[in-house]
């Protein structure tokens, strides 16, 4: 059903046909758009002992629905399957807000403390930095952006999530990237499911697109 | 907190003494007397621990512990000539939340377990005889959930029901006659039934299309034992474990599905996944067990297929322990069997009457849980003890009943 099977479709440019049905020209255009978003919004400068990567997901739901889930810094559990509970210190949501996230059992962490670095409702950009917790992701910083696109002639959304993080002692860059990507794939798969379910429940009028 | 810790230390000492009791000959030296006095104090503290931890956090382990003393009284004595034993003499189970915030372990005990679904049996010749055999079989299981308790709870509700169906279907298909082939066929049928059961329950827990966020990332280990008059069938999926005490020797009846087990790692990699050491070896760096019920997001790397052991019983078989890794992470198979043996034989209770409350299977399970807590287990802890043969002498038993 949802399994994280195979490599295809996650990396930027992998999924040239992601827009669906449009043939090589449209696919090329979609790939070019992704590359442009990447260059403009997801440029990390990983250090010697860091790794960085980006993943993409095409969602069959309009941008405003997907963005409403992504932007809820205080409620990541709305779509992130590994989060059991989240509390924002202070209450008000603003740049610099810090959330305490509790992670479900069976995972290599139980808590994570994360700071909101950037929330841009015009450009649809969310950036979060990990500042504490019992996980092994030191200096983890992520950027999520969402972009409107057309999937089979219907309003869809392209989500790009990129990150940079220290490679911990005892692991290689490759392993670190693989692990983080596995977690992000789960999150994006779940984001797609929740968004698509919402889209079916509340079909949007053409005016909202 | 500090008093809590010291109580646990005391409990640990009591257990160490119980362990050591085996080797010590009963000469009342001064040190032995001092130890006894010390233990008397421990008796109170240990029962305080029992009140705090057990009463508050111990989940009533079905009705098995109250059952067990009853069934112990009526159970027929095994006779040496016949190669059939009562499926189990008694059984007991304890399941505690331990130091975790959530309780995600579940246990289930049903003895006899096939009798419940008897009405479902097709009437016909030969069925009555089969039923006579079935009634002796006991079902015992430990489920250790992760990512939530939903799948472990589903296992507790469904595994024995589904297994009964799968076993019944295969039993009814069985032809008459005897011989060595029948034995082999029977074993093969048990393996099939277990595999079919695990697959079906795995399908049930992940099914719903409209599943909520997080439904895909819930799972549970499962270790299931069916104890019959002639053999024990253990099916395991994950890192809970079944261990048999045979003539005082611990014989594991399951092999943990850890991602770094060479054959498991090979299987995961062949399926396109990776095992990464990220706070211990994990599938994709995420999950620390390589097989489970549920965990749809990790398929096909994490599978629900059980490994099945069919073990013929011998007259040396004493008891069976099923437990979650909350026990096995801190207690070895050998130590667990030794503790349970001392308890079931009545030696622990007669030597330390105030720290060890009795010699039933439930007492043995409780003692193992205490030991795990005292050794710093941070997980939920679930232990099922199935007594296969009376270890206690009649005199000890009657003394205890009269106390």
UniProtKB/Swiss-Prot annotation, chain A:
Residue positions of motif Latch loop: 135-137
GO CC terms for this protein? cytoplasm; cytosol; nucleus
The site feature described as Involved in interactions with PP2Cs is recorded at 108, 172
Disulphides? 51-177
Q: Which residues form the signal peptide?
A: none
Q: What's the chief localization of this chain?
A: nucleus
InterPro entries reported in the protein's UniProt record? Plant_def-hormone_signal, Polyketide_cyclase/dehydratase, START-like_dom_sf
Q: Which UniProt keywords apply?
A: Abscisic acid signaling pathway, Cytoplasm, Disulfide bond, Nucleus, Protein phosphatase inhibitor, Receptor, Stress response
Q: Where in the cell is it found?
A: Nucleus; Cytoplasm, Cytosol
Miscellaneous comment text of the record:
Plants overexpressing PYL5 exhibit abscisic acid (ABA) hypersensitive phenotypes. Plants overexpressing PYL5 exhibit tolerance to salt and drought stresses, but are hypersensitive to osmotic stress and ABA during vegetative growth.
Its quaternary structure? Monomer. Interacts with PP2C30. Binding to PP2C30 is dependent on the presence of abscisic acid (ABA). Interacts with PP2C51. Binding to PP2C51 is dependent on the presence of ABA. Interacts with PP2C50. Binding to PP2C50 is dependent on the presence of ABA. Interacts with PP2C53.
* Listed name of the protein: Abscisic acid receptor PYL5
Q: Which organism is it from?
A: Oryza sativa subsp. japonica
Gene from which this protein is expressed? PYL5
UniProtKB/Swiss-Prot annotation, chain B:
InterPro entries per UniProt? PP2C, PP2C_BS, PPM-type-like_dom_sf, PPM-type_phosphatase-like_dom
Where is there biased composition of kind Low complexity?
62-71
Q: Which SMART domains would you find in this protein's record?
A: PP2C_SIG (SM00331), PP2Cc (SM00332)
As to how many cofactors bind and how, the note says: Binds 2 magnesium or manganese ions per subunit.
> Which GO biological process categories is it annotated with?
regulation of intracellular signal transduction
**Where is region (Disordered) located?**
42-80
Q: Where does Mn(2+) 1 bind?
A: 144-145
Q: Which GO terms describe its molecular function?
A: metal ion binding; protein serine/threonine phosphatase activity
**Pfam annotation, one family:** PP2C
What is its EC class? hydrolase
What is this protein's name? Probable protein phosphatase 2C 8
Lineage, broadest ranks: Eukaryota, Viridiplantae, Streptophyta, Embryophyta, Tracheophyta
